From Swiss-Prot:
Optimum pH is 6.8. It comes from Homo sapiens. The gene is UROD. It is linked to Familial porphyria cutanea tarda: A form of porphyria. Porphyrias are inherited defects in the biosynthesis of heme, resulting in the accumulation and increased excretion of porphyrins or porphyrin precursors. They are classified as erythropoietic or hepatic, depending on whether the enzyme deficiency occurs in red blood cells or in the liver. Familial porphyria cutanea tarda is an autosomal dominant disorder characterized by light-sensitive dermatitis, with onset in later life. It is associated with the excretion of large amounts of uroporphyrin in the urine. Hepatoerythropoietic porphyria: A form of porphyria. Porphyrias are inherited defects in the biosynthesis of heme, resulting in the accumulation and increased excretion of porphyrins or porphyrin precursors. They are classified as erythropoietic or hepatic, depending on whether the enzyme deficiency occurs in red blood cells or in the liver. HEP is a cutaneous porphyria that presents in infancy. It is characterized biochemically by excessive excretion of acetate-substituted porphyrins and accumulation of protoporphyrin in erythrocytes. NCBIfam families: hemE (TIGR01464). GO terms for biological process: heme A biosynthetic process; heme B biosynthetic process; heme biosynthetic process; heme O biosynthetic process; porphyrin-containing compound catabolic process; porphyrin-containing compound metabolic process; protoporphyrinogen IX biosynthetic process. It is found in: Cytoplasm, Cytosol. Changing Y164F: 25-30% of wild-type activity. This is Uroporphyrinogen decarboxylase.
Length: 367
């Protein structure tokens, strides 16, 4: 620590590094915990802040993103913050129009339909320069966190971004995106390469701006079986990690732990554990003991309580957390949900989840 209390990048010195130590595989006094979508609509203060402007205008406001990121930290003793943003800012920066339709979700008025539509996309190298507002939000949030907990940056993985860009929004089948994989494999690889080339400088830029860890969301992994996943998703997941780490080294920046969360990607756990990430996130369909057997001690695991468990009583939440922590064990583990928090969840039950993780994980270490 420097004499003025600032860290090497001029940010306040980190006071709680439990999350980072667990991510790197070091011993911790208790199990760290954070929640995907912890900055979300289940919080009344979030709804109030968001009511002032539309979704992507909020994403482009560093002040609003900072405020939304900090809100859950004021309520709960979480061990990490994750910047408020959206994975679809990357397709926007590539030149695609994206709107957020209330009650429906993201919509692309002009999705990619033909191979020649790829010509509409901007050079991926300009993406980071288009997303300065995300970097500003990260820097502002890092300052205002005042070293309380680490700040996580994130992005969507190439396949998941491709699904939105081709489907034109969400889909229960991803049939249009998968049609590309079968009918236009070369164009699919071209698009996935464009996205990878856009993501690498974007993620590096987040670290330069102050992010202390990075999570890559492969939210639509489950729409691919092992064969398609290994061909169209895994190579790019690997490449993102490899290139981000190389660029950080070249820039003389300290490495940050990287997390891969491939929802419903249980069939690829072993491959994901060897993809160059320090942490593998799990959804609730994976049994913790089986996951640990599969990946061994090579990576930290993160997850994986069913988000709907938070509809249970606070007492039952405590019991479910105890079982989860017993199954994962105290080493190389970060507690989280198996997916994001839902808008109708009770903040009190989120607090019960966080408190139960801290309480039981301390007891585990005493025994």
């Amino acid at each position: 620590m420097e004499a003025n209390g600032l860290g090497p990048q001029g940010f306040p010195e980190l006071k709680n590094d439990t999350f980072l130590r667990a991510a790197w595989g070091e011993e911790t006094d208790y199990t760290p915990v954070w929640c995907m979508r912890q900055a979300g609509r289940y919080l009344p203060e979030f709804r109030e802040t968001r009511a002032a402007q539309d979704f992507f205008s909020t994403c482009r406001s560093p002040e609003a993103c900072c405020e939304l990121t900090l809100q859950p930290l004021r309520r709960f003793p979480l061990d990490a913050a994750i910047i408020f943003s959206d994975i679809l800012v990357v397709p926007q920066a590539l030149g695609m129009e994206v709107t957020m339709v209330p009650g429906k979700g993201p919509s692309f008025p002009e999705p990619l339909r033909e191979e020649q539509d790829l010509e509409r996309l901007r050079d991926p190298e300009v993406v980071a320069s288009e997303l300065g507002y995300v970097f500003q939000a990260i820097t502002l949030t890092r300052q205002r966190l005042a070293g309380r907990v680490p700040l996580i940056g994130f992005a969507g993985a190439p396949w998941t971004l491709m699904t939105y860009m081709v489907e034109g929004g969400g889909s229960s089948t991803m049939a249009q995106a998968k049609r590309w994989l079968y009918q236009r494999p070369q164009a699919s690889h071209q698009l996935l390469r464009i996205l990878t080339d856009a993501l690498v400088p974007y993620l590096v830029g987040q670290v330069v701006a102050g992010a202390q860890a990075l999570q890559l969301f492969e939210s639509h992994a489950g729409h691919l079986g092992p064969q398609l996943f290994n061909k169209f998703a895994l190579p790019y997941i690997r490449d993102v990690a490899k290139q981000v780490k190389a660029r950080l080294r070249e820039a003389g920046l300290a490495p940050v732990p990287m997390i891969i969360f491939a929802k419903d990607g249980h069939f690829a756990l072993e491959e994901l554990a060897q993809a160059g990430y320090e942490v593998v996130g799990l959804d609730w369909t994976v049994a913790p003991k089986k996951a640990r057997e599969c990946v061994g001690k090579t990576v930290t695991l993160q997850g994986n309580l069913d988000p709907c468990a938070l509809y249970a009583s606070e007492e039952e939440i405590g019991q479910l957390v105890k079982q989860m922590l017993d199954d994962f064990g105290p080493h190389r583990y970060i507690a989280n949900l198996g997916h994001g928090l839902y808008p109708d969840m009770d903040p009190e039950h989120v607090g019960a989840f966080v408190d139960a993780v801290h309480k039981h994980s301390r007891l585990l270490r005493q025994n």
